[in-house]
């Protein structure tokens, strides 16, 4: 694979990740950590849920 092909592939992978990270940073766990909607905030008991600021 040429260098430009690798670069293009890397960019294609990074764009969705950064978009996802941006969306996730708009939400936070009850513990204060950023998270994505629908995730359990890394709490095995599932008590901490992901909430949108201002709600």
From Swiss-Prot:
Keywords: Disulfide bond, Knottin, Neurotoxin, Secreted, Signal, Toxin. Its main location: secreted. Residues 1-21 form the signal peptide. GO terms for cellular component: extracellular region. Expressed by the venom duct. It is found in: Secreted. Disulfide bonds join 24-36, 29-41, 35-50. GO terms for molecular function: toxin activity. The keyword Metal-binding does not apply. Probable neurotoxin. The cysteine framework is VI/VII (C-C-CC-C-C). This is Conotoxin Cal6.40. It comes from Californiconus californicus.
């Amino acid at each position: 694979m040429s260098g430009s092909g690798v670069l293009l592939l890397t960019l294609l992978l990074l764009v969705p990740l950064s978009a996802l990270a941006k969306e996730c940073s708009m939400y936070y766990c009850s513990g204060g950590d950023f998270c994505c909607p629908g995730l359990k905030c890394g709490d095995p008991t599932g008590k901490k849920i992901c909430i949108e600021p201002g709600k």
